[in-house]
């Protein structure tokens, strides 16, 4: 677990993704929910597409349960950042969800490559109130420790 977490936290996040865990989980939830919502607009979903929607809903449920567990411990600023991050992610899906062009919606549904690996680790950390910094690649032996 520590090795996967170290790798996830060492990777650069996509443009627009929050760096703090609580807002990041809200952003991840909005992205995966938007993708599932888009998939549900398709009239001729393949079994694989239907499975992606199902898995997306499960992942979103996990993110929302983590957000709910962590919410009482968040500052007003963290909650506001989470709301802003979720709104920004939802806004990215809005034009596609409103589109009457099913072929374009289908193509966009197929282009969603998934969430950063950090999303699942951030959800675990906020759910379990883990406040220590995540492990680094050096901590888990993937890199040489920095020279002092």
Map each language-model feature to its residues.
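Charged, low-complexity, helix/coiled-coil-prone segments
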Residues: 1-9, 53-64, 142-143
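Short amphipathic alpha-helical segments and their helix-coil junctions
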Residues: 1-17, 93-103
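Short N-proximal segments of mature Sec-exported proteins
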Residues: 14-73
